[in-house]
Amino acid sequence: MSYKENLIPSSCSSSSSSSSKFATPSSATAAQRVLRKQPYVSIFTTPSDNLLAQRAQLAPRVTPAASSSVPGRVALGTDVASHNTALAEAPKRKFTIDDFDIGRPLGKGKFGNVYLAREKQNKFIMALKVLFKSQLEKEGVEHQLRREIEIQSHLRHPNILRMYNYFHDRKRIYLMLEFAPRGELYKELQKHGRFDEQRSATFMEELADALQYCHERKVIHRDIKPENLLMGYKGELKIADFGWSVHAPSLRRRTMCGTLDYLPPEMIEGKTHDEKVDLWCAGVLCYEFLVGMPPFDSPSHSETHRRIVNVDLKFPPFLSEGSKDLISKLLRYHPAQRLPLKGVMEHPWVKANSRRVLPPVYQSSHPK
């Protein structure tokens, strides 16, 4: 979940039978790429007063990743790692908005705002996302928020934004998130136009490692794109929006979610899909990193659809053979033919160009 609120109505739904108002909208609409980008505002304000808190338990402690022996890759310092794990070490307690000093807004969206915040008792710095229940109910996207909390709060990976905790009152829901000091990757891409091979390969290795971690836990993201990525203290990539994600034990879904430019053929054609949709998205993302725009970008939705299902892939002349090889192996019509995430991390172009800050932490089995 990025700092810009990115929950939008869709035909996506979970099969929950909850008796609350958390209902799914009945009208199905084609997913579109909607950018909600606003500049930071350097004011000091508090979003609320007189609030009632719900008991919320803090997540278990996270151990910082060990140093990597791979040349050119440096482990994150313990000072930064401790910043990211400090909340997990605090005693269990109740939270209210009065427990926080609220700083400048980090982002604004349709359903609320995100603020830089400091927990008063232990001086923890974080991003506090404040969402209005009335707006969530009005748009029928409460199920997405519930799903996002359920998924993101259990993920522990250096390239996935931490959700430490959450609490709520009568009108608002508050998400306690890891603060990503370097901000939004989308803005960085806009600023530079496109990234060089070293930065693109580094991001691809980090993304592949994080997605492999998710897939091992049967979590499909389904909406990887620059708008849903942030950058940490060392500029490392962090997946930050799980609004369209699903925890699917069967790893097979049929709803069409995500962003038009990034939708794979099987989702456009309404076929059953699995975790390999994220492989397609990774290929689109790599292309956009290097070129500055998605590979199937067209004036109309129908033309974009046509180009995607036909895999009408065109490379500009300045791309290297290695990068084109990686992208071509990810953007395959048949999901089973797409390069696995391990293959992305071991691809010669990635290994030759990546300057990753954090070592891989993917494990082949669940932690006990």
UniProtKB/Swiss-Prot annotation:
Signal peptide location: none
Key word Nucleus present: yes
Compositionally biased tracts (Low complexity): 10-23
Enzyme Commission numbers on file: 2.7.11.1
Notes on activation and inhibition: Kinase activity is stimulated by cell-cycle specific phosphorylation.
List of residues binding ATP: 106-114, 129
Family matches, as InterPro entries: Aur-like, Kinase-like_dom_sf, Prot_kinase_dom, Protein_kinase_ATP_BS, Ser/Thr_kinase_AS
A GO MF label: protein serine kinase activity
Organism superkingdom: Eukaryota
Active site (record annotation): 223 (proton acceptor)
SMART domains assigned to the protein according to its UniProt record, in alphabetical order: S_TKc
Entry GO CC: centrosome; chromatin; chromosome; chromosome passenger complex; chromosome, centromeric region; cytoplasm; kinetochore; midbody
Keywords on record: ATP-binding, Cell cycle, Cell division, Centromere, Chromosome, Chromosome partition, Cytoplasm, Cytoskeleton, Kinase, Mitosis, Nucleotide-binding, Nucleus, Phosphoprotein, Serine/threonine-protein kinase, Transferase
PANTHER family: SERINE/THREONINE-PROTEIN KINASE IAL-RELATED (PTHR24350)
Stated role: Serine/threonine-protein kinase component of the chromosomal passenger complex (CPC), a complex that acts as a key regulator of mitosis. The CPC complex has essential functions at the centromere in ensuring correct chromosome alignment and segregation and is required for chromatin-induced microtubule stabilization and spindle assembly. Involved in the bipolar attachment of spindle microtubules to kinetochores and is a key regulator for the onset of cytokinesis during mitosis. Required for central/midzone spindle assembly and cleavage furrow formation.
Protein name: Aurora kinase B-B
Species assigned in the record: Xenopus laevis
Gene that encodes it: aurkb-b
